[in-house]
Amino acid sequence: MNNTDLLVADKLFRMQLAEVRKSKKMTQKELSKISGLSESCISNIESGEQSSPTLRSIIRYATALGIDIYINIGGKDK
C-alpha cells in the first residue's frame, strides 16, 4: 500500500465512523458520555485532525456505537 492508498483508506474509515454515529442519531457529545472519550477526541478522530488515534480510542468509539472493528494485518500477496 502506498501513501495515497493509506490516506484514502484513513479518510474512508473516519467517514464511516461518523456516518455510523449519525445513522444512530447520536451527537458527538452523547458519544463522548458513553465512550468516555472527550468531545474533542471524537471530533479529531472523525475529522482527521488527530493523525493517529490510538487503537484504544477507536475501540472505545466503536464499542459505544455497538459496532465491531475488524483489522486485517498484512497485505495482498504479490
Residues of each region from the PLM?
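DNA major-groove recognition helix of helix-turn-helix/homeodomain DNA-binding modules
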Residues: 56-71
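N-terminal flexible/basic segments that precede or flank functional cores
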Residues: 1-15, 68, 78
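Short basic helix-loop element that most often maps to the first helix and adjoining turn
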Residues: 15-34, 60
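Recognition helix of helix-turn-helix/homeodomain-like DNA-binding domains
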Residues: 36-52
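Residue-level recognition of specific faces of alpha-helices
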Residues: 16, 41-44, 57
